[in-house]
UniProtKB/Swiss-Prot annotation:
Family listed: Belongs to the monovalent cation:proton antiporter 1 (CPA1) transporter (TC 2.A.36) family.
GO MF entries: potassium:proton antiporter activity; sodium:proton antiporter activity
GO cellular component, one term: phagocytic vesicle membrane
Catalyzed reaction equations: Na(+)(in) + H(+)(out) = Na(+)(out) + H(+)(in); K(+)(in) + H(+)(out) = K(+)(out) + H(+)(in)
Xref: NCBIfam families: b_cpa1
Compartment(s) of residence: Late endosome membrane; Early endosome membrane; Recycling endosome membrane; Cell membrane
Subunit details: Homodimer; phosphatidylinositol-4,5-bisphosphate (PIP2) and phosphatidylinositol 3,4,5-trisphosphate (PIP3) could be involved in the dimer stabilization. Interacts (via the C-terminus) with RACK1. Interacts with CHP1.
Gene field: Slc9a9
Tissue spec: Expressed in hair bundles and in vestibular hair bundles. Expressed in brain.
Topological domain ranges for the Cytoplasmic compartment: 42-45, 148-164, 225-235, 299-309, 351-364, 408-429, 487-644
Swiss-Prot/TrEMBL GO biological process terms: defense response to bacterium; phagosome maturation; potassium ion transmembrane transport; regulation of intracellular pH; sodium ion import across plasma membrane; sodium ion transmembrane transport
Protein name, entry field: Sodium/hydrogen exchanger 9
Protein keywords: Antiport, Cell membrane, Cytoplasmic vesicle, Endosome, Ion transport, Membrane, Sodium, Sodium transport, Transmembrane, Transmembrane helix, Transport
Length: 644
């Protein structure tokens, strides 16, 4: 071996441990500084630089200091030694050095061009996170919180549009970015900046899929603060939530695309196999997440855990996390599973929780989401200097900037035109321009890019992704408020209090669940809400009509077993609305809440009197439900007792 080896002693190991504590402390102070800056921004209503942009700035400063103010601690770390006797890479390796045996663990494969001059810098290596930390620790709380805090009323009103943008729009963005980048790659080969065969079309599609993941967290935070039009907020929020899940599964499907003959040629069988993998993984992850939420709902319904809020909250958290881990263990996508687990938990399990657990779960995941987001954005700034294998290519970066803007335009404007053909409440041009402007890149694109940085194309993608995130967060995030003013989008809208806070009672939760429909998918909603109200809600929660009144007589034992005793009492008090949309009219079945009223006028008066007791309640006769010219009728639900 060339040179004398410096062996690690027990004293050196203690030094490394103390050094690790110092590095974690530095990162901790970085987060503290970020939190204080956020308070300063909120206190002075400073909207030209969002908190996430500030976190990235602090990360950049810290990374700059670590990069150039620290020296390598192990001069032999970058030296390559040949082991001709090994035919494969074992998970652990025992090495005898001067009669002392040392154990080494496998980390990753490193190509010759990946060996950095900073390879021996222990501080930079420690500040470079394992990519799996993002997917297994930091991303799940963010995605679960997005599903758990989903404002269902406006989301389901615009569900058809949201699904179109999330699924079809993401696919369009992926293909457009892939095609444009393939053209720039060919130009790079022609200019001699890239070798022919180093960057294939599948690599371009892979880059397109990860860059299709939008993360307008900065824009949405400003929207929430300014109370922007609820429909615009919901379209953008709903698209970003589902778009993340679609982009992750799409990226995985492209990465396992493997034709039999030429691995980089188009193969019809391999293409349809990838499509099948996409659908199977997405459906399986959806089922896994929903199943864990159903189990949680049943446990919280049929046990007395509500008497012990700490245990109830702990069980809720662990089962929700298990949805992610089980999906990953089964070869599915944990992010998709935990997203739909959060949506289902909010729809069913939340109603079974005690008041303490409702508050605790909401605050717990809100806090975890806040902390995880700021950790990720701080680390983005760090990664620009601590990542040791950046590849900056001006032509590739220029092509990526052009590609994401063109792809966003090909996504928003054509799909909005098609959606407006069938919508009563059109998506106006200023909404479309704002959605085009809000296509920021963030945590998901960064996590997908950093997960695989072994080859030169992947390293170039990661570097470019990092720069795109910086640009979109700083420029587009900071320009959100001026853009709202320029596009004349209304702010300070208070049409739906549920956009600002969760329902404050069981009755309001049921009302929000039922008071939603859209002409674009009325038949589907009529079937779903009827099934949900009559069967799923009574099975999984204490609300809804007793199963003894909705199931056939021969199901008597099962219905009595699954019906909660509280359901009989709640049946008389429940303020539940079921929207049924037909071709010519809308019949709304409405259960009375007051024992002294049966007319709509009386009901409205009582709702106004009780508004002080039930915060966030919405008058169903006000605002635009998006029902067009349908006639609204009120009918007493058959089979339900009417209070006199």
């Amino acid at each position: 071996m060339a040179g004398q080896l410096r062996l690690t002693s027990g004293k050196d190991e203690d030094h490394f441990q103390h050094q690790g504590a110092v590095e974690l402390l530095a990162f901790n102070f970085l987060l503290i500084l970020t939190i204080l800056t956020i308070w300063l921004f909120k206190n002075h209503r400073f909207r030209f630089l969002h908190e996430t942009g500030g976190a990235m700035v602090y990360g950049l400063i810290m990374g700059l200091i670590l990069r150039y103010a620290t020296a390598p601690t192990d001069i032999d770390s970058g030296t390559v030694y040949n082991c001709g006797k090994l035919l494969f890479s074992p998970s652990t390796l025992l090495v005898n050095i001067t009669d002392q045996v040392y154990e080494y663990k496998y980390q990753r494969e490193i190509n010759q061009h990946n060996i950095s001059p900073h390879q021996g810098n222990a501080i930079l290596e420690k500040m470079t996170f394992d990519p799996e930390i993002f997917f297994n620790v930091l991303l799940p709380p963010i995605i679960f919180h997005a599903g758990y805090s989903l404002k269902k009323r406006h989301f389901f009103q615009n569900l058809g549009s949201i699904l179109t943008y999330a699924f079809l729009g993401t696919a369009i963005s992926c293909v457009v970015i892939g095609l444009i980048m393939y053209g720039f790659v060919k130009a790079m080969v022609h200019a001699g900046q890239l070798k022919s065969g180093d960057f294939h079309f599948t690599d371009c599609l892979f880059f397109g899929s990860l860059m299709s993941a939008t993360d307008p967290v900065t824009v949405l935070a400003i929207f929430h603060e300014l109370h922007v039009d609820p429909d615009l907020y919901t379209l953008l929020f709903g698209e970003s939530v589902l778009n993340d899940a679609v982009a992750i599964v799409l990226t995985y499907s492209i990465s396992i695309y493997s034709p039999k003959e030429n691995p980089n040629a188009f193969d019809t069988a391999a293409f349809f196999q990838s499509v099948g993998n996409f659908l199977g993984i997405f459906a399986g992850s959806f089922a896994m997440g929903s199943a864990y939420a159903v189990v949680t709902a049943l446990l919280t319904k049929f046990t007395k855990l509500r008497e012990f809020p700490m245990l109830e909250t702990g069980l809720f958290f662990l089962l929700s996390w298990s949805a992610f881990l089980s999906a990953e263990a089964a070869g599915l996508t944990g992010i998709v599973a935990v997203l739909f687990c959060g949506v289902t938990q909010a729809h069913y399990t939340y109603n079974n929780l005690s008041s303490d657990s409702k508050l605790r779960t909401k605050q717990l995941f809100e806090f975890m989401n806040f902390l995880a987001e700021n950790v990720i954005f701080c680390y983005m700034g760090l990664a620009l200097f601590t990542f040791q294998n950046h590849i900056f290519n001006a032509l590739f970066i220029l092509g990526a900037f052009l590609a994401i803007f063109v792809a966003r335009a090909c996504n928003i404007y054509p799909l909005s035109f098609l959606l407006n053909l069938g919508r009563k409440q059109k998506i106006p041009w200023n909404f479309q321009h704002m959605m085009m402007f809000s296509g920021l890149r963030g945590a998901i694109a960064f996590a997908l890019a950093i997960r695989n940085t072994e080859s030169q194309p992947k390293q170039m993608m990661f570097t470019t992704t990092l720069l795109l995130v910086f640009f979109t967060v700083w420029v587009f995030g900071g320009g959100t408020t001026p853009m709202l003013t320029w596009l004349q989008i209304r702010v300070g809208v208070d049409l739906d209090e549920s956009l600002k806070e969760e329902p404050s009672s069981q009755q309001e939760a049921n009302k929000v669940d039922k008071d939603m429909t859209k002409t674009e998918s009325a038949q589907l909603f009529r079937m779903w809400y009827g099934f949900d109200h009559k069967y799923l809600k009574p099975i999984l929660t204490h609300s809804g009509p007793p199963l003894t009144t909705t199931l056939p007589a021969w199901c008597g034992p099962v219905s009595r077993l699954l019906t909660s005793p509280q359901a009989y009492g709640e049946q008389l008090k429940e303020d539940d609305v079921e929207c049924i949309v037909n071709q010519d009219e809308l019949a709304m079945n409405y259960q009375e809440q007051s024992p002294t009223s049966s007319s709509p006028a009386t009901k409205l008066a009582l709702d106004q009197k009780s508004s002080g007791l039930t915060l966030g309640k919405e008058n169903i006769y006000e605002g635009d439900l998006g029902l067009g010219g349908y006639e609204l009728k009120l009918e007493q639900t058959r089979g339900q007792p009417q209070m006199d």
